[in-house]
């Protein structure tokens, strides 16, 4: 099960520590740290999402990976073996902050909640509004309001 870190609102001390350690090096290279995802499993994964105004290519990911690896090797915050992945947010862009939702008002989003609302954890609809830490999504013509803290995972739904 993935653990997400919303910049500014951490799920755990580890996610906070990781973001504090890698945010400055990522930004020093000229990229935005969109968010991180730490997936705990038999082979754990630390996934770092980066972006820039010019987009992201493989060389950008490699540069950030080398820089972040060096920081993590020195600080050694993760006590289990893990794989490091660096990528762009991609077409199914993950949403981490209230600002991300605000930027994509009018776009379709798939949301997985930590705790069910109306006996449902999975929702898909159009982002209508953001009010502080509350996100309004229009689902089948009806507005549903979710607390950002209750969102386990959310991604844009691309249309082709």
UniProtKB/Swiss-Prot annotation:
GO terms for biological process: ribosomal small subunit assembly; translation. Required for maturation of 30S ribosomal subunits. InterPro entries: Ribosome_maturation_RimP, RimP_C, RimP_C_sf, RimP_N, RimP_N_sf. It comes from Enterobacter sp. (strain 638). HAMAP family: RimP. It is found in: Cytoplasm. One of its GO terms (cellular component) is cytosol. PANTHER family: RIBOSOME MATURATION FACTOR RIMP. Pfam families: DUF150_C (PF17384), RimP_N (PF02576). This is Ribosome maturation factor RimP. It comes from the Bacteria. Belongs to the RimP family. Its main location: cytoplasm. Keywords: Cytoplasm, Ribosome biogenesis.
């Amino acid at each position: 099960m993935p653990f997400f870190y919303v910049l500014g609102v951490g799920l755990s001390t580890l996610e906070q520590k990781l973001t504090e350690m890698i945010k400055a090096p990522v930004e020093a290279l000229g990229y935005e740290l969109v968010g991180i995802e730490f997936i705990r499993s038999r082979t754990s994964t630390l996934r770092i999402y980066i972006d820039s105004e010019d987009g992201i290519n493989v060389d950008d990911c490699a540069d950030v990976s080398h820089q972040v690896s060096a920081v993590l090797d020195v600080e050694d915050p993760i006590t289990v073996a893990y794989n490091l992945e660096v990528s762009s947010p991609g077409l199914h862009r993950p949403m981490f902050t209230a600002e991300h939702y605000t930027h994509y008002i009018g776009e379709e989003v798939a949301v997985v909640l930590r705790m069910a609302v109306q006996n449902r954890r999975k929702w898909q609809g159009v982002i209508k509004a953001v009010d502080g830490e509350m996100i309004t999504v229009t689902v089948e013509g009806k507005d549903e309001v979710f607390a950002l803290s209750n969102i386990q995972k959310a991604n844009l739904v691309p249309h082709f």
